[in-house]
């Protein structure tokens, strides 16, 4: 076509430059976006356009998140908590030992709290994988000062074919779970449950 291929960050920034007057911010999600070595530079360039930056992470890379925090290029972070200590590796298939994953999540959450970065901790409540007692363990583990969001499981949006037949909890069950956990967090809410 005669048009050179641009690196992905340049394409992103060009698009954002074109539409920035219509946008308030950008959410960088994944996979795990903190695995990308150029993420801090991309976030900085987005901030230089006058846009807010939200990053979604699983909490396993606190060192990479610390770079974003130190450079002041992230406005909000959502940490996907996959399960309570003792179940994270099994639920995610991660190659890291369970203890390393637990420590990484703790470091991530503590970094956000200490730096005063607005954030939320969130868990997708998959029946059969995340039970009410798991949520209580997670609340006891991560309590104090964060927003905790229970996300409704959507079987039509899962990558795992074995979960497509799982029936999500009724919305009232999730709302009751949020009420039960509300004493552990500054706020506990439900997302995607109607």
Model-found features: residue ranges?
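Canonical Radical SAM [4Fe-4S] cluster-binding loop centered on the CxxxCxxC motif
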Residues: 1-11
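A C-terminal junction/extension of Radical SAM enzymes
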Residues: 173-194
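Conserved AdoMet/S-adenosylmethionine-binding subsite of the radical SAM
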Residues: 13-25, 34-171, 177
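Short, charge-patterned binding micro-sites
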Residues: 30-31
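N-terminal [4Fe-4S]-dependent radical SAM core
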Residues: 1-3, 18-22, 189, 193-194
């Amino acid at each position: 076509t005669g048009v050179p291929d641009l690196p992905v960050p340049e394409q992103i920034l060009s698009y954002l430059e074109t539409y920035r007057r219509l946008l308030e911010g950008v959410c960088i999600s994944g996979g795990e976006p903190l695995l990308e070595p150029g993420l801090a530079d991309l976030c900085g360039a987005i901030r230089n356009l006058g846009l807010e930056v939200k990053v979604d992470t699983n909490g396993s890379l606190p060192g990479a998140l610390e770079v974003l925090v130190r450079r002041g290029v992230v406005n909000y972070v959502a940490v996907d908590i996959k399960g309570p200590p003792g179940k994270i590796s099994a639920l995610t298939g991660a190659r890291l030992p369970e203890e390393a994953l637990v420590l990484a999540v703790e470091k991530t959450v503590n970094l956000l709290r200490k730096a005063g970065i607005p954030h939320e901790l969130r868990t997708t409540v998959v029946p059969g994988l995340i039970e009410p007692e798991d949520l209580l363990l997670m609340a006891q583990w991560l309590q104090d000062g964060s927003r905790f969001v229970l996300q409704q499981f959507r079987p039509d949006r899962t990558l795992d074919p074995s979960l497509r037949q799982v029936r999500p909890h009724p919305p009232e069950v999730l709302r009751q779970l949020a009420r039960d956990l509300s004493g552990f967090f500054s706020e506990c809410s439900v997302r995607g449950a109607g």
